[in-house]
């Protein structure tokens, strides 16, 4: 499998997340310490506190996305490494509705990665996350987990719209969308009908589209387009 990723972009976002979270915490500390030594600044301490809290929360949110291990792209690459070079995976393409997309010989598979521990259920047509105290406390600085069925429908529609616009309707390609849970402590329970969601160890089986093989021209057009969005070549 061919892998496309702009490591400089990922590293830059990781550094910004760390700077924002550390900078916010330093401002919070300053809002407490400065008034102790400069009493005339006491009236401004709340400004530092609000700004610091906001920066810290934003920084922690993006640190969970860009710094937390295991990294989403590493997990996907490992799970799909047995695919041959007719499969191309693109991580974090710019101005694209999904962060990870797989071009296969038979279509496109968009992947929404969830890097959270916890228990998730799909029962009787309803999606539910078991909310623990720890998760509730971290909820504001962690990603939301949408219903995989709703996500899949919206993502497929958006990708079809984007591809039609980009290629003026000249390229038609089957599209599939999956929610992939990569955290080893995740519990995923699905009752009844299957849904477009899986844990990482089941991804290879799910990352397929039963369809005719794409013709060479649309396949190459899609490959070049996604490569340009991902690494800029």
Which residue stretches match the model-derived regions?
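Surface-exposed interaction regions that form or flank ligand-binding interfaces
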Residues: 1-98, 103-109, 114-124, 129-233
């Amino acid at each position: 499998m061919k892998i496309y990723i702009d490591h400089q972009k990922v590293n830059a976002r990781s550094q910004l997340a760390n700077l924002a979270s550390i900078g916010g915490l330093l401002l919070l500390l300053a809002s407490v310490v400065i008034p102790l030594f400069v009493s005339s600044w006491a009236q401004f301490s709340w400004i530092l506190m609000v700004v610091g809290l906001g920066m810290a929360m934003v920084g922690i949110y993006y640190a969970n996305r860009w710094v937390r291990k295991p990294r989403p792209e590493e997990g996907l690459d490992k799970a799909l490494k047995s695919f041959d070079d007719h499969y191309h995976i693109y991580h974090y393409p710019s101005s694209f509705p999904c962060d990870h997309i797989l071009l296969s010989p038979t279509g496109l598979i968009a992947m929404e990665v969830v890097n959270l521990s916890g228990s998730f259920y799909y029962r009787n047509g309803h999606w539910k996350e078991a909310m623990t105290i720890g998760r509730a406390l971290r909820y504001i600085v962690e990603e939301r987990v949408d219903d995989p069925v709703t996500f899949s429908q919206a993502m497929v529609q958006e990708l079809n719209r984007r591809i039609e616009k980009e290629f003026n309707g000249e390229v038609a390609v089957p599209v599939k969308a999956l929610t992939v849970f990569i955290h080893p402590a995740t519990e995923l329970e699905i009752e009844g009908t299957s849904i477009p969601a899986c844990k990482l160890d089941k991804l290879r089986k799910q990352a397929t589209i039963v369809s005719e093989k794409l013709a060479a021209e649309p396949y190459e057009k899609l490959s070049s387009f996604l490569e340009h969005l991902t690494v800029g070549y």
